Amino acid sequence: MSTTTVITPGTITREKNENGAPLYPDYMPFYDPLEKVEDIGAFEHFDPGHRADPKLPNLLKNATKVWELSPHVGTEIHGVQLSQLDSAGLDELALLAAQRGALVFRDQDFVNIGFDAQKKLVSHFGPLHIHGWAPHPAAGSEEHMIIYDHKDDLRVRQSWAGRSPVQWHTDQSPEQQPPGTTFIAMLESPTTAGGDTLVSSSVRAYSSLSPRFRKRLEGLTAIHTNNDGVSQELKHGQQAVMRRGVLQAEHPVVLVHPVTKQKALYVNPVYTKKIVGFDQEESDCILKFLFDHIAKRQDFSCRIRYEAGTVLVWDQRVTNHSQTLDYPIGDRRHGFRLTPLANKPIPAKIEEDDEEFSTDDARHLVGNAS
């Protein structure tokens, strides 16, 4: 089958079949409402980043170009083939993803190594999540969550009808042990550009708050649930949501990453619904501020553009992200996500005499007085 390469501004290459057929038919979305998804249950998670050499010799030994997409989040790496990394290299990948939030790898053969090899590589970071209603490949594994938007399947568009398609979130935060290091492989991107992923640093979202407000948030927990998402899918006739049903978990508002020990704001507007112990109106007020803080502070976010062979690796414990449906209806955006689950979120707590609080508070007081 013949293909054509589409060149868009910014030298992004996007291959397309001349007859309009998908480039990767084996990854077409398959929905089966009769399948039941079993809960993995509690498990002990050891983050591979603990074993990593902080100098990253195994990860970056073949790198030809490495640069930061923004000061606080995002690094693009050329010359490294993810499929060729050994265990030590994957450990270092986990560490760098935790430190930088999101990593972009170009010219990858990851798509071509097959379902089983993909799962084996990504399961290095934890047991793989199976989505409660999103599709998977008909001939592949349930762990592969298919990302698909095209004129022959407008379910993504229907799900976001009447709402902004830019919705900052952390995938599957209603799980008792939510995702950590996660992979997206883009198979086919819109011909007109667009379809990027936005990523925001939750570490910087936390640290950029005033010290007294940070202190107030620490020790709080919030309810995360997918109830709204399940209801929305049922509204559009998506019976596959009943494969798993409604999930709910209580997580700290501020967590600590198990490897880097950095504190991160762990709330998102898609799944976080209420701060425990607060009246609903009080909770809504605080959460609205935090959601706006995440969405509006572009000084700690980056934008991931896709091209053929791009793989995005990011740590969901220290980031929020969003899709962008900014391309014409009918243009194809096709990819898949593999999502390892990680540790139960670790709550952050600063004591009254914490040096970090005292130092930062003094800095803010000086700034306010000037």
From Swiss-Prot:
GO cellular component: cytoplasm
Keyword Iron: yes
EC number: 1.14.11.-
Start-end of Low complexity biased regions: 1-12
Listed cofactors: Fe(2+)
Pathway participation: Alkaloid biosynthesis
Keyword terms of this UniProt record: Dioxygenase, Iron, Metal-binding, Oxidoreductase
Pfam families: TauD
Binding annotation for substrate: 131, 337
Stretches for region Disordered: 1-20
Uppermost EC category: oxidoreductase
UniProt binding sites for Fe cation: 169, 171, 321
Cofactor note: Binds 1 Fe(2+) ion per subunit.
Residue numbers binding 2-oxoglutarate: 197, 333, 337
Gene Ontology molecular-function annotations: 2-oxoglutarate-dependent dioxygenase activity; metal ion binding
Stored InterPro entries: AtsK-like, TauD-like_sf, TauD/TfdA-like
Role of this protein: Alpha-ketoglutarate-dependent dioxygenase; part of the gene cluster that mediates the biosynthesis of communesins, a prominent class of indole alkaloids with great potential as pharmaceuticals. Communesins are biosynthesized by the coupling of tryptamine and aurantioclavine, two building blocks derived from L-tryptophan.
Similarity comment: Belongs to the TfdA dioxygenase family.
Name assigned to this protein: Alpha-ketoglutarate-dependent dioxygenase cnsP
Organism: Penicillium expansum
Gene that encodes it: cnsP
